[in-house]
Amino acid sequence: MGRYSREPEIAAKSCKARGSNLRVHFKNTCETANAIRKMPLKRAVAYLKNVIGHKECVPFRRFNGGVGRCAQAKQWGTTQGRWPKKSAEFLLQMLRNAESNADYSGLDVDRLVIEHIQVNRAACLRRRTYRAHGRINPYMSSPCHIEMWLTEAESTPEGAKKGKKKKGTKDAVEKSSKRVKTAATAAH
């Protein structure tokens, strides 16, 4: 068993998965992992399948030099996005591994949320490409290590979610301003 960068707060309610020296681009995998962080497990699996099928994109926020724009990135509040198929496949495989670990531990798979996911650089692998006039250039690959753990979310009553509205939301402000206007017109 390898060492993780962090440990979950409640180990009994969480499951882990990790992969080392994976032959998949570090930068693409980092952006894909950032997109699925804090997602429920079922939504993350559906999202990664949509990325593979080009139905949803992965927003590129940090490693975005030379990345083209796409309309699907608007739902993430950015303009640049791609569909890193291989990264999505590797993360999907790791999520399945974590799901089977959770099932083995007796956790409720439907309530799992990706609490922690981290992508680190692995040692670069060196190859060579032959250039004109007898020169040789490096042909490097950037593999990565991935670690994640999922925890069971606390179930909250659905009535409490739907019934309460935040104080400063747009709807609440509009309603209060309408009340003030009607009270002002009634006074005159």
Swiss-Prot record:
Presence of the UniProt keyword Transport in the record: no
Gene Ontology cellular component annotations, sorted alphabetically: cytosolic large ribosomal subunit
GO terms assigned for molecular function: structural constituent of ribosome
Region described as Disordered: spans on this chain: 155-188
Keywords: Ribonucleoprotein, Ribosomal protein
SUPFAM superfamilies with a match to the protein in the record: Ribosomal protein L22
Entry's family note: Belongs to the universal ribosomal protein uL22 family.
Protein name: Large ribosomal subunit protein uL22
Organism: Agriotes lineatus (Lined click beetle)
